[in-house]
């Protein structure tokens, strides 16, 4: 596995959306923000999830998988997984999504994706509204534009990458 190559490809794709998969039922959610790096001498993938999202509670078990579609791929699936909640609908059934078995963390990936990152949470921390740069607060957390009065802050989940691989057909 050329880890750096996988990270570079995933980084190019993140703005178009990738799947964050969590929970025993492998609930997929579309995310557009993530960060890859080395922290505490470990390869780490950091994802951000708002408190209001169904996936937020699922991430409490300390494991997640990020599945990265090929460039331009799975657009409809990403759209649905970014607009529908797993509280209300089984997105895997709705979209006829299949999964690929996990290799290390027990959380499968979404089949048909190019790359999968399996992670275990090392740390979770809340975005501090008081410490956030004011322009970012106004743009992403201003209570007037959010569904909740507190601006629906994110939790950052720092996940040690236990496995990173291309999907084989």
Place the predicted regions along the sequence by residue:
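Active-site-proximal mixed secondary-structure blocks
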Residues: 1-31, 35-169
């Amino acid at each position: 596995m050329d880890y750096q190559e996988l990270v570079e490809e995933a980084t190019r794709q993140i703005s178009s959306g990738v799947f964050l998969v969590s929970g025993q039922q492998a609930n997929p959610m579309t995310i557009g923000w993530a960060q890859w790096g080395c922290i505490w001498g470990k390869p780490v993938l950091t994802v951000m999830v708002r408190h209001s999202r169904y996936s937020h509670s699922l991430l409490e078990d300390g494991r997640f998988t990020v599945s990265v579609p090929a460039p331009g791929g799975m657009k409809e699936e990403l759209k649905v997984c970014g607009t529908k909640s797993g509280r209300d609908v089984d997105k895997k059934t709705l979209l006829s999504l299949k999964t690929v078995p996990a290799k290390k963390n027990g959380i499968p990936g979404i089949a048909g994706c190019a790359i999968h990152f399996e992670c275990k949470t090392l740390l979770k921390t809340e975005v501090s509204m008081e410490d956030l740069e004011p322009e970012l607060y106004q743009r992403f957390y201003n209570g007037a534009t959010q569904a909740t009065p507190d601006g629906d802050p994110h939790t950052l989940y720092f996940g040690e990458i236990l496995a990173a691989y291309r999907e084989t057909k």
